Amino acid sequence: MLFPVKRLIIENTGYKRDISLRTMYINSSSIASITDYDGATEFLLRENSDLQDKSFSLIKLNNIADDIIALGSAQQIYSTVREHKTGKHLLHD
């Protein structure tokens, strides 16, 4: 079952970095682990970003080397995964 997360995107534009959030959909059966990630907060503080007061999680996926830094605590994301796994949803929701 696919569920939405807001992924932290950091793009190096030369002398500064552009920081944004982008919605992406993850298949819940491909998740290996979800952990709280304090490293994002420390980085955002250094970059003086307006996202510095938010919590972030590190999502590790099976068979993919790239990890996802997502907006929300590990508990919040886990709750979203469980909600999408147990509930019936229309494909376009």
Tell where the protein language model's regions lie, with residue ranges.
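Acidic, Ser/Thr- and proline-rich intrinsically disordered linker/docking segments
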Residues: F3-P4, I9-N12, K16-Y25, S30-D93
